[in-house]
Amino acid sequence: MASKLKTFINLRDYPITLFNQIRSLSSRILTPINQSHYRKRILLANLLQRYGFPPSSLQHFLSRNNHLLNSDLVETEISLGILLSLKIPQKSLVSLISDCPNVLRSEFLRKWRVPLSNCGKHGVVSSSAIKSVLEHSSRIGIGPDKFNECVRVLKSLGFCDSTVSRILSSFPGVLLVNEIEIRRKIEFLVGIGIARDNIERFFHVFPEVLGIGTETRLKPLLDEFMKMGFSKDDVKKEIAREPRVLGLELGELPRCLELINTLKCREVIRVSIISEGAFRAGFEVKLRVDCLCKYGLIRRDAFKVVWKEPRVILYEIEDIEKKIEFLTNRMGFHINCLADVPEYLGVNLQKQIVPRYNVIDYLKLKGGLGCDIGLKGLIKPSMKRFYNLYVMPYPECERIFGKRKENVRVNKRHPAGLWKLMKPPSNLTTKEDVQNMKSFIESLA
């Protein structure tokens, strides 16, 4: 009985072991369909990598665009060859495919190859303009005939090749704007005082104006400027100086000026902000708000940041962008942190932010921090307090932070003894003054 029981146990264990072996083997052997899918994925990845696609982003790109696996690899390679023949730089080519993978359709590119090649050979349009036109047309289904007509109209207006390229690159939506609307826009600009000689410069600086309605946006915007108390000459001067003024939304400039009027800052900063006039100051606020919104802040938080840190209005846009990129890319914070710590944008990047971050990063790697230091703990402390907390206890941080020169003798602003020359002369007490004081004291007694 015991031997029979032993045999039964062995038989019972055997199928389980066999099943486990079969299951592990089947997990390593793909079905023909999955094997073909996996092989095609590898071939497509190798093809894209051969044309300059970075390996680090291939996995994410293919997972978002599974439809590319259903396309013919030969056709995909032909499409990549056509894009390369248009002399699009490798970085722009990768960006175009990542943002708009539909551009790899071979039938689409065959239609566009000849018109774009001809314009590129004659220098009419640049590679950046070709990229923008392809991306825009693949999304909304525009044909080459619209492109040829648009280029013809712009050239007939007397615009040079660089201006045509600039318009197509920054505002490819011009392909849908007809000739009558473009001429109407020119007449509007001439009517507000822009000289015809400056029209081309105007479109080169702000090509997006071609997509703004004359009756629905531009004329009501000018009426709003007049109602705010600005004269026609002031408006003309500001528009000629900065064409992007016409990109303001209705009600946007009053809101920016209201923010300036409610600022709580030192008088020196306020005077610097409005030194070039209220109109210009309001527009500078709009540019800073747009810059913050471009990186992900909602409009309300962007206004809040500018109101709490008015020095942002005085800084160049490039400096603000450098600080934001350092905050998000290097420090790893989210852009929304600026709503809580707007002071970050008001301090010097190289002199304060970078040294402090390097010290905190070093201490974090060495395990010298008991808790996580947020953006507020990094920016809020004064220079002396930060030094005493994080630098002075660790001698190796002196080199990272920059050694404080405590014993350096500070040069005096004025020569010694100057106070004696500036001291006002003392009043001499006469006998008459003494008599008057005695009389006053006696009257009190």
UniProtKB/Swiss-Prot annotation:
Q: Where in the cell is it found?
A: Mitochondrion
Its keywords, alphabetically, are: Mitochondrion, RNA-binding, Transcription, Transcription regulation, Transcription termination, Transit peptide
- Mind listing the GO biological process terms from this record? DNA-templated transcription termination; regulation of DNA-templated transcription; RNA splicing, via endonucleolytic cleavage and ligation
Please provide, in alphabetical order, the Gene Ontology terms of the cellular component aspect for this entry: mitochondrion
Residues of the transit peptide: 1-25
Which InterPro entries does the annotation name? MTERF (IPR003690), MTERF_sf (IPR038538)
Name the predominant localization.
mitochondrion
If researchers knock out this gene, what phenotype do they report?
Severe growth and developmental retardation. Dwarf plants with small organs, altered organ structure and nonviable seeds.
Gene Ontology molecular functions: double-stranded DNA binding; RNA binding
User: Into which family does the record put it?
Assistant: Belongs to the mTERF family.
Q: What does this protein do?
A: Transcription termination factor required for mitochondrial NAD2 intron 3 splicing and normal membrane respiratory chain Complex I activity. Essential for normal plant growth and development. Binds to RNA but not to double-stranded DNA.
Q: What is this protein called?
A: Transcription termination factor MTERF15, mitochondrial
The UniProt gene name for this protein comes to MTERF15
